[in-house]
From Swiss-Prot:
Known function: Acts as a chaperone.
GO molecular function annotation: ATP binding; ATP hydrolysis activity; ATP-dependent protein folding chaperone; heat shock protein binding; protein folding chaperone; unfolded protein binding
A Gene Ontology biological process term: protein refolding
Up-regulation conditions: By stress conditions e.g. heat shock.
Name of the protein this chain belongs to: Chaperone protein DnaK
Species the sequence originates in: Thermodesulfovibrio yellowstonii (strain ATCC 51303 / DSM 11347 / YP87)
Family note: Belongs to the heat shock protein 70 family.
Key words, A-Z: ATP-binding, Chaperone, Nucleotide-binding, Phosphoprotein, Stress response
Chaperone among keywords: yes
Compositionally biased intervals (Acidic residues): 620-632
Modified sites of kind Phosphothreonine: 198
């Protein structure tokens, strides 16, 4: 039986992952990259290019290079979103006979699912090269706020690419699954997902082994693309002021501006200022024109502030729908490349009143979650004989691949217990019941006993149908599981018997594994926190060096730069919490010496000829920064 892969089909980039030996792996593409640009191009020779190679030639071939196709998935041509996209995108968008938005390249019309399928095929091929076997099944993620037509379009893209789409799952749910937060108890979490083209906020409640999505909201037309557009518009307006030329009429110039805007935006996540240099951007009667501008982080934040603020309204709605306040959220998870923007992180932190969790790569986490879900769906059925008491908990897989216990371990038999579940999607007419035994929080980590399906559920909005799942262990230790639709009375059941059950040693091993994983989760969190602390310290000290560098002796500057590099190296390479903390402490001491030197110099200048009010203010600034560093 072949492997099923997990795919994050993104607006800007796409990622493919697979679970190998119980661990999710992000699969590199043919160019060795872990993310693949969601770009498709057609050359004048009739060649089709996908990914990085397509993105590289976009400047010289803008009309035949398709990007951000996800924004057109499942949309009507006359929709406001498509009409807005037409103004911005260099390729031709046309109306299909059914009213959908299609693209036209060299006289040939393509549907968005067709273009998306080309991206999926590249990812499928990368997975086959990696695994050395054909891949025919996948779980593909979509924004939680995607409507039915957008979801169907995504599923169609999979079929076109030769993939049997086992499931379409929501990106925030996949992210929560990959982060492993489902292993914690009694937690309310918010997943803030700002990607290249879409924004989602999901409020999830985790407790007693169940992931329950309490509310979701979002904007399927808000993302990093819009940030790029703001920078592009600023560049165009500034250039127009300088040269009197409107670059909007030049498609090749627009493509260069788009790439430069995206690059500048990314650089400003770590730098305070960046230079945008586009020689020969255009020409007029007087000769060629060059674009050379500086963009500061502060200016970028000013340009995109309303976009970031726009994401807060869905957050408020989702919290309201969930019946929760910001203070009741225990953990905030950032997903999507655009959440690397410091201003986004600050706004989210201010809104929820707590620092967001940054433990996993926001570009890859959704694909990893999809791969885990794919592995869960491909679980092998194994029969087992149960003993007089049930030594391990029995339950089923629920939303997000979580193990929901129905009968706890050490329950005396015979026993019979029931629980009511519901559907996870609108108009769902069937549910698959997967029966597991074990103590781990994720179903895939436990032992799969059997699978059966309840069909014929009348179509209804998700959350409306009531499915009663009953576990019945008789005196012979035989487990019967049934699922009944309470509205129609339709029922399906499975009887699990086996010639050999779990041995005592296997039971002990499962318990040990569960405990070991709990410890491992704690250790990973400690490492993430230590690295965050190191990042903060490095940023603070580097800022002090930039601001006060001319007042520090050369020897002292050299010592502190060495301490910064050492701290950064250890942070990036070490998995030892104590080693990272020691490096942070060493850097803190080095920065403290700088503070003392600055303080002494400030004191000496005060004793000189009458210090001015301005110098006193500077002293105050220095002291405040020293205090802030020490507090950290």
């Amino acid at each position: 039986m072949g492997k099923a892969i997990g795919i994050d089909l993104g607006t800007t980039n796409s990622v493919v992952a697979v679970v190998v030996g119980g661990e999710p792996v992000v699969i590199p593409n043919q160019e060795g990259q872990r993310t693949t640009p969601s770009v498709v191009a057609f050359t004048d020779k009739g060649e089709r290019l996908v990914g990085q190679v397509a993105k590289r030639q976009a400047i010289t071939n803008p009309e035949n290079t398709i990007f951000s196709i996800k924004r057109l998935m499942g949309r009507k041509y006359n929709s406001q979103e498509v009409q807005e996209a037409k103004k911005r995108l260099p390729y031709k968008i046309v109306e299909a006979p059914n009213g959908d938005a299609h693209v036209e390249i060299m006289g040939k019309r393509y549907s968005p699912p067709e273009i998306s399928a080309m991206i999926l095929q590249k990812l499928k091929q990368a997975a086959e090269d990696y695994l050395g076997e054909p891949v025919t099944e996948a779980v593909i993620t979509v924004p939680a706020y995607f409507d039915d037509s957008q979801r169907q379009a995504t599923k169609d893209a999979g079929r076109i690419a030769g993939l049997n789409v086992l499931r379409i799952i929501n990106e925030p749910t996949a992210a929560a699954l990959a982060y492993g937060l489902d292993k914690k108890k009694e937690e309310k979490i918010a997943v803030y997902d700002l990607g290249g083209g879409t924004f989602d906020i999901s409020i999830l409640e985790i407790g007693e082994g169940v992931i329950e999505v309490k509310a979701t909201n979002g904007d399927t037309y808000l993302g990093g693309d819009d940030f790029d557009i703001r920078v592009m518009d600023w560049l165009i307006e500034e250039f127009k002021k300088q040269e009197g030329i409107d670059l909007r009429k030049d498609r090749m110039a627009l493509q260069r501006l788009k790439e430069a805007a995206e690059r500048a935006k990314i650089e400003l996540s770590s730098a305070m200022e960046t230079e945008i240099n586009l020689p020969f951007i255009t020409a007029d009667a007087s000769g060629p024109k060059h674009l050379l501008m500086k963009l500061t982080r502060a200016k970028l934040e000013q340009l995109v502030d309303d976009l970031i603020q726009k994401s807060l309204e869905p957050c408020k709605k989702a919290l309201s729908d969930a019946g929760l306040s910001q203070s009741q959220i225990d953990e905030v998870i950032l997903v999507g490349g655009q959440t690397r923007t410091p201003k986004v992180q600050k706004v989210v932190q201010d809104f929820f009143g707590k620092e967001p969790h940054k433990g996993v790569n926001p570009d890859e986490v959704v694909a990893v979650g999809a791969a885990i879900q794919a592995a869960i769906l491909k679980g092998e059925v194994k029969e087992v004989l149960l003993l007089d008491v049930t030594p391990l908990s029995l339950g089923i897989e629920t939303l997000g691949g979580v193990f929901t216990k129905i009968i706890e371990r050490n329950t005396t038999i015979p026993t019979k217990k029931s629980q009511i579940f519901t559907t996870a999607a609108d108009n769902q007419t069937a549910v698959t019941i997967k029966v597991y035994q074990g103590e781990r929080e994720m179903a895939a980590d436990n032992k799969l006993l059997g699978v059966f399906e309840l069909v014929g559920i009348p179509p209804a909005p998700r959350g409306i149908p009531q499915i009663e799942v009953t576990f019945d262990i008789d005196a012979n230790g035989i487990l019967h599981v049934s699922a009944k639709d309470l509205a129609t009375g339709k029922e399906q059941s499975i009887r699990i018997t086996a010639s050999s059950g779990l041995s005592e040693e296997e039971i002990k091993k499962m318990i040990r594994e569960a405990e070991a994983h709990a410890e491992e989760d704690r250790r990973k969190k400690q490492i993430a926190e230590a690295r965050n602390e190191a990042d903060n310290m490095i940023y603070t000290v580097e800022k002090t060096l930039r601001d006060m560098g001319d007042r520090i002796s050369e020897d002292e500057r050299k010592r502190i730069e060495e301490a910064i590099e050492k701290c950064r190296r250890i942070k990036d390479t070490s998995n030892d919490v104590n080693e990272i903390k020691a490096a942070v402490e060493e850097l803190a001491k080095a920065s403290h010496r700088v503070a003392e030197e600055l303080y002494k110099k400030a004191g000496a200048s005060q004793q000189g000829a009458g210090s001015t009010t301005q110098s006193k203010k500077e002293e105050d600034v220095i002291e405040a920064e020293v205090e802030d560093k020490d507090n950290k």
